[in-house]
Structures are given as C-alpha cells and as structure tokens.
UniProtKB/Swiss-Prot annotation:
GO molecular function, one term: RNA binding
Function: Involved in transcription antitermination. Required for transcription of ribosomal RNA (rRNA) genes. Binds specifically to the boxA antiterminator sequence of the ribosomal RNA (rrn) operons.
Family designation: Belongs to the NusB family.
The protein's name in its UniProt record: Transcription antitermination protein NusB
C-alpha cells in the first residue's frame, strides 16, 4: 500500500474512533478488513498514544477556534498530520503538509483544506 493510501485509511480509522468511540483495534480491522499495512497502523496507534500532546500542539494554532468545535474529519486529519510532523523523522514536513491538503480536498472541502493548510503551516517548519 502506498503511503497516500495508508494516510487515507488511517484518517478513516481515526474518524471512526472519534465519531463512534470505537476501539483502536476495531477501527483498524474495520478499515483494513483482511489487509495489513504497518505504516497505517503506526499512524493510528501513534496518534492515539499521543493524542493529548497532539491536541495541545493544535489548539493554540486554531485562531479563534476550539478543538471541540472542529468537524471530526478535519480534527482527525490535523491529528494525523501533526503526528507525522512531530514524531516521524522520515517524512519531510512539506510532504505531510501537501498530503494533508490533498486528502482534505477528498474527504472535506476546499474551505477545510485551506484551514488545515493554515493551521499546519503555523506548526510545521518547512525545513525538516
């Protein structure tokens, strides 16, 4: 599975966890069915293990928004992206930013992709 697809599947799993209060294992199983992808699982597990710290990074960059007011797709995608930016050294920040914007265009809307871009641009230095 390509990393873009792994990110999309991770977003879907994180969304299920957030919306349905589903367990991490059940969400991964629902999304992946009989497939397995180590990167997708690393993303979901990493976001959930570091959720409080990730949210603490996101919240001050929301510019007059509260994290609990964000729609669940945007919140899940922001968490996923911040995890990649802050915890994974092998993913350049520019790649994570671009992937997030493109995925937002698919699963959310143009306004959300611009919002996500703005939040992540405040969080991620482009030189990593």
């Amino acid at each position: 599975m390509k990393r873009r697809e792994a990110r999309e599947k991770a977003l879907q799993a994180l969304f299920q966890i957030e919306l349905n209060e589903m367990s991490l294992d059940q969400a991964i199983k629902n999304i992946m069915e009989d497939e397995q992808d180590d990167y997708m699982e690393q993303l979901v597990e990493g976001v959930m293990a570091n959720k409080a710290e990730i949210d603490a990074i996101i919240e001050p960059n929301l510019d007059n928004w509260r994290i609990d007011r964000l729609n669940k797709v945007d919140l899940s995608l922001l968490r996923l992206s911040v995890y990649e930016i802050k915890y994974l050294d092998d993913v350049p920040n520019r790649v994570s930013l671009n992937e997030s914007i493109e995925i937002a265009k698919i699963y959310s809307d143009e306004k959300s992709s611009k919002f996500i871009n703005g939040v992540l641009a405040n969080i991620a230095p482009e030189d990593k």
